[in-house]
Amino acid sequence: MNKYISIACMALAITCITFTAGYAHEGTELSSKDLASQIGKTESELKEIDKKIIAYNEKVIANQADADAHFNLGVLYEQKMKFNDAISEYQKTIQLKPDSIEARINLSLVYTERNMYEESVGTLKQVLEIDPDNVDAHKYIGRSYYKTGLLNEALEEFKRALELEKKDPEIHCYLESVYFSMGRLDDAVAELKKAIEIDPQFKTAHLNLGFVYYEQGKLDEAMEEYELAIGIDPKFADAYSNMGLVYCEKKMFDDAIKILKKAIEINPTLPDAHSNLGFAYWNKALKNEDEELKKKAMREVTIYKGLVGAQ
């Protein structure tokens, strides 16, 4: 979940990861290097995925009824963000194996990537017809309801999922998202603390807790959570990006610029980091009456817009 706050004509963006990362999809012209960065793979790993795609395509050509091959193709296409192809392969899997829960779950997640929430919910309800107590189905139905603004319905699904699986920290993060959207920040904090109690190494929970603290004006507490997230994953670009905003809020623009450059070094295609760096440059420029810094700020905003347009 991304939050954007306009200040002095600059976009201030702070990240609260809730469900899935904001990936690009078909139609996006990305270099292999940029694609690798987007999906967290190396270029050599992408080449291995391509080899597997070729191999499984050969399998389905030889045997169109090979449900497992179609399923594996769906997984590989999903990894490459070829979502239309992934949808097609998962649908073929379901035709061949009508009781396949895993194919339906994966299909629903791809629908969500394409903002096809109605289709996602419909597919997940098919899962519940097969297995009424499927935790993932309740979680992901809740996620689609949340994404479409059906907060009470989302809350009901997440609570049902939690009844079925009390030790799933992710569900607490989902509940936090709903409570945050309802303005129930104390409840949001409570859910994130429960997630961290279950899994102290859950970096997303620390990131989101930092986000809620930031919204509450508790800057020191927010910084502490971001530092914990980075301690868990030193390459967690979102945490560096959010940390930069805390520095901006404290008027520590040099520190903000330094940490935001670190975020971009880790993930050059993270939109929020570019937006936030532009925000830091802009505010430092206003403070120092520096036209060159304003140019740097606008360049970062241009990069940000290009990246958002590519998603």
PLM regions: where:
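Helix-start (N-cap) detector for alpha-helical repeat units in TPR-like alpha-solenoids
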Residues: A67-D68, I101-E102, V135-D136, P169-E170, ...
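N-terminal leader/linker segments that initiate helical-solenoid repeat arrays
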Residues: T20-N72, L76-M81
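Bacterial N-terminal signal peptides
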Residues: M10-I17
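Structural signature of tandem alpha-helical TPR/SEL1-like repeats
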Residues: S44-E58, K80-K92, E102, E113-Q126, ...
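Terminal, low-structured helical/coil segments at or just beyond the last alpha-helical repeat
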Residues: G27-G40, K47, S275-Q311
